[in-house]
A protein has these predicted regions:
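Substrate-binding/catalytic cleft of secreted carbohydrate-active enzymes
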Residues: 1-153, 157
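Carbohydrate-binding surfaces of carbohydrate-active enzymes
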Residues: 97-270
């Protein structure tokens, strides 16, 4: 297969899952390092191959399986479901680390859809699939459901789970590098640092709005080249402590890219 690909298309790089198994047989059949389930800092060792800080062996690395939502921590999911929110924080750490790593190509969440199947008790025979499953759950956890579990960002009916939004936030190509609570001076502009994480799109090719006290206004974006940082300016308003400021970014086709909600000063406690 390697020989055919290289003879047919010399421009196409080749990836091979579990590349250490090929190296073990002295087969040089990959240009891209495929690794699975590194930690949030990009470190993992598999079959004699390893990455550190999302890099390894002097070639580009693609983590073609990573970061499925929490589905194996059965007891924790029952007692502390907020682990699902924390999963989004870890995904954000991973993508931000990989984005800045030389040769870091990307990471693919495995998988998109929950894998749970609710099966009735059989009229004849035994429920062999429960014992057969490699990821057998505690009986009080799974009931008559089998499968790897709720490891998707949409459920079995393709409804978006909270993890869907966490994924959009983590992979967002527009990142405001400011704290959730903004310092301000009433009647003066707000200056926000922004990171353009698009690969090809200049920031002035998209558009943005800001909403303050229920009034939404357009926001002019200055040129910021891909993979660079710049500033956006929120025009002066009569800012007040505890009020919220919402900033939204849209594609040229008016599709939502990301939303940020900030508190001016100290949040009001009701």
């Amino acid at each position: 297969c390697w020989d055919w690909i290289k003879a047919t298309d010399t421009t196409r790089p080749v990836i091979f899952s579990y590349p250490g198994s090929a190296v073990e047989k002295k087969a040089e059949i990959f240009d891209i390092l495929s690794m699975h389930y590194q930690n949030v800092y990009g470190n993992v060792g598999q079959w004699g191959m390893a990455t550190r800080n999302f890099q390894g062996h002097g070639i580009p690395a693609l983590f073609d399986e990573w970061a499925h939502p929490a589905c194996y921590t059965y007891a924790t999911l029952q007692t502390d479901p907020n682990i699902r929110e924390f999963w989004g924080k870890s995904l954000d750490m991973m993508w931000s680390g990989l984005f800045n790593a030389p040769g870091g190509l990307g990471g693919a969440i495995w998988g998109y859809v929950d894998e749970t199947f609710s099966l009735p008790e059989p009229k004849f025979g035994t429920s062999f699939w429960k014992e057969f499953a490699r990821t057998a759950k505690p009986l009080d956890y799974q009931g008559n459901c089998v499968g790897y579990g709720e490891w998707g960002i949409v459920d079995v009916w393709r409804r978006q789970k909270p993890e869907f939004w966490s994924t959009k936030k983590a992979y967002s190509p527009v990142r405001l590098l400011v704290e959730d609570n903004l310092s301000f001076t009433t009647g003066q502009e707000l200056m926000l640092t922004i990171h353009n994480r698009f690969d090809h799109t200049n920031l002035n090719e998209i558009h943005a709005t800001y909403t303050y006290r229920g009034v939404t206004k357009s926001l002019e974006l200055q040129p910021v080249a891909p993979h660079t940082k710049g500033m956006i300016v929120i025009p002066a308003e009569q800012w007040e402590n505890g009020e919220t400021l919402q900033v939204e970014f849209f594609t040229a086709a008016n599709e939502l890219i990301d939303v940020y909600r900030f508190v001016l000063g100290t949040e009001k406690i009701i």
